[in-house]
């Protein structure tokens, strides 16, 4: 099911999301978020953007003709290296874009959709999108 994406200045976008404890309860949410992300279209979507205050993000930086969604639950950045800047946009802020400084490489710790531990070092566009989505989970927008 395609979910409604909240638009700025909706106050729910500024709220820090809650940690997920029950993974059985988020399976449909994850499926709906992935469908919503592709329909938007976007490369990432955080649960607070669809009005759900949980630390869940879905990401896909694959070429448009491929679908390889990456799910992060309760993500946290453990370390970061380097700096890069890229012009970012946001599904919750249609239209405006801004040049944002981000870490070039990050080490992220999270859980997958089933609750299994996940640790990954990523760089490039995937690292940038993960940082953007974690900002949403912390109640921050790229214009803040």
Q: Where do the model's predicted regions map?
A:
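Positively charged
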Residues: 1-144
């Amino acid at each position: 099911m395609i979910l409604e994406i909240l638009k700025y200045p909706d106050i729910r976008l500024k709220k820090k999301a809650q940690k997920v404890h029950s993974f059985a309860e988020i399976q449909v949410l994850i499926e709906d978020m992935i469908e919503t992300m592709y329909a938007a279209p976007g490369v990432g979507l955080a649960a607070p953007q669809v009005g759900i205050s949980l630390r869940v993000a879905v990401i896909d930086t694959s070429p448009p003709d491929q679908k390889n969604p990456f799910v992060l639950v309760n993500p946290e950045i453990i370390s970061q290296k380097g700096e890069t800047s890229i012009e970012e946009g946001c599904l919750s802020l249609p239209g405006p874009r801004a040049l944002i400084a981000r870490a070039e490489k990050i080490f992220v710790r999270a859980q997958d959709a089933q609750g299994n531990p996940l640790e990954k070092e990523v760089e490039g566009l995937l690292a940038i999108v993960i940082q953007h989505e974690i900002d949403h989970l912390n109640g921050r927008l790229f214009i803040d």
